[in-house]
Amino acid sequence: GEDGVLQGLLEATNVPYVGFGVAASAVGMDKLLMKAAFAAAGLPQVRYAGVRKADWGSPPRRAALLPGIEALGLPLFVKPACAGSSVGITKVKRAEELDAAVAAALAVDATALVEEAADAREIECAVLEGTGGGPTEASIPGEVVPGHEFYDYEDKYIDDRSYSVIPARIPDATREEVRRMACAAFDAVGGAGFARV
C-alpha cells in the first residue's frame, strides 16, 4: 500500500481509510518524484541522477548518462527509485563498483536513483497533519544510529546493532530546523494523517 495502489483500490470501492491518499503515496514511494516535489518546495538535497533500465542497457545512452553520474563524485548511493526498507541499496566507493550497484537497483525497479553520499546522520521526526486548517506539526527529532556503515536492510530487520537516541543529540537551532524541514517535506508530497520523516 505504500505506492498508492491500495489507496486507489479503497477509493474505487468507497472504503474509508486514513493516511496518505493515492497521489501522495505514489510520490512518497518514488524517490525521483519525491525529489522533484522537494525541489519545488525549496528543500535542500544532495545532487542526483535518475537511470532508467532501458537507458542503462543501451551502450550509447549509458555513455550519455555517465558524465552526469561521474560529476556527482564518490562515494555514491545507488538505490531503486521505487522500493522501501533499503532493499537494493549499494554504497559505491570506487568507480568500478557502479555497474554492479546500478544492476542491483535495476533488479528491484525499472529506474535507479544515483546520488552523492552525504556525511549525514539518520535524524527523523514523527509528523502529524494539522487539524482544522492548522499547521503541520513535528515531534522532537530522534536519531537512528546504524550498526553498519549505513542504515541498511540488515540493520532494520535482521540484526540488533542499530539503536535509537530520543531526543537526537543536536543543537536547539538544528532541532527546530529539522522539525521545520520535516513538516515542509510532508506538505510537499501532500501528506495526510501522519508519517515518519
Please report, for each region that a protein language model flagged, where it lies by residue.
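Short glycine-/acidic-enriched loop or helix-start segments at secondary-structure transitions
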Residues: E2-V5, V87-G88, E124
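Active-site nucleotide/adenylate-binding loops and adjacent lid/helix of ATP-dependent enzymes
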Residues: V27-R121, T131-G132, R180
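Conserved metal-phosphate-binding beta-hairpin within the catalytic cores
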Residues: L10, E116, A126-V127, F186-V197
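A short, GP-enriched loop/loop-strand-helix hinge that lies immediately N-terminal to
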Residues: G1-M29, P44-K53
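A short, local hydrophobic-aromatic micro-motif
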Residues: V18, V46-R47, S139, Y151, ...
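A general structural signal for well-ordered alpha-helical segments in protein cores
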Residues: D3-L6, K31-M34, L98, A138, ...
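Phosphate-binding site of ATP-dependent enzymes
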Residues: K93-R180, A185
